From Swiss-Prot:
It comes from Campylobacter jejuni subsp. doylei (strain ATCC BAA-1458 / RM4099 / 269.97). HAMAP family: PlsY. PANTHER family: GLYCEROL-3-PHOSPHATE ACYLTRANSFERASE-RELATED, INNER MEMBRANE PROTEIN YGIH. Its EC number is 2.3.1.275. Keywords: Cell inner membrane, Cell membrane, Lipid biosynthesis, Lipid metabolism, Membrane, Phospholipid biosynthesis, Phospholipid metabolism, Transferase, Transmembrane, Transmembrane helix. GO terms for cellular component: plasma membrane. This is Glycerol-3-phosphate acyltransferase. It is found in: Cell inner membrane. Probably interacts with PlsX. InterPro entries: G3P_acylTferase_PlsY. Belongs to the PlsY family. It is an enzyme of class 2 (transferase). It comes from the Bacteria.
């Protein structure tokens, strides 16, 4: 019963769309109706930048931090309390699933990059660092957020086998579940990348 309560709480917490809340409160804008209609930091920056560039950067950064924290903080607490690895990985998956398929948004949501990074920094920090470097380099070169995110995801998966071939839970299944969720949410971006129609973020 205790585990079920934890899982429900994490899903509900993960479902909170901070980008949507921040832009409605501070920018009086509904990002679900503008830009890419995503609730993530990239769309926050893109939409709010048209009206207030300085505010756009602040809200985008705040969105990243809060989306990151809603996965990282609960996992840190549970890890400190010595919950087992199976539960921690389940919590990580649920936090990301909640962000991507929010119950508050009729199971729509973001794309899971910041929340995924928040979850994985607790469980696989070296892999997240590797992914961050790839994300930063790809973003710097191509200036395309989705391409940088997908490249980082690939780097994360590969490095998870290099640095942690035998995870404590003896399976990489949660890594692939998380990757599947993120790739699924990026399918429209992948299509635009193939046809060279994806917008740059400058």
């Amino acid at each position: 019963m205790e585990n079920l309560i934890i899982y429900a709480f994490i899903y509900l917490l993960g479902s909170i769309s901070f980008g949507l809340i921040l832009t409605k409160f501070f920018a009086k804008t509904d990002i679900k109706k503008e830009g890419s209609r995503s609730i993530g930091a990239t769309n926050v920056l893109r939409v709010v930048k048209e009206k207030n560039p300085k505010l756009a950067k602040k809200l985008a950064i705040a969105t990243i931090i809060l989306d990151f924290a809603k996965a990282a903080i609960p996992l840190l607490i549970l890890k400190f309390l010595h919950y087992d690895q199976a539960l921690l990985w389940s919590v990580a998956v649920l936090a990301i699933f909640g962000h991507c398929f929010s119950i508050y948004l009729l199971f729509e949501g973001g794309k899971g990059i910041a929340t995924g990074a928040g979850a994985m920094i607790v469980l696989l920090p070296l892999e997240v660092l590797t992914a961050f470097i790839v994300w930063a380099v790809t973003g710097k070169i191509f200036k395309i957020s989705s391409l940088a995110s997908l490249a980082a995801l690939l780097a994360f998966i590969v490095s998870s086998f290099i640095f942690n071939y035998d995870l404590e839970i003896h399976t990489h299944a949660p890594v692939f579940i998380i990757a599947f969720i993120i790739v699924y949410k990026h399918l429209p971006n992948i299509k635009r990348l193939i046809f060279k129609e994806e917008c740059k973020v400058i």
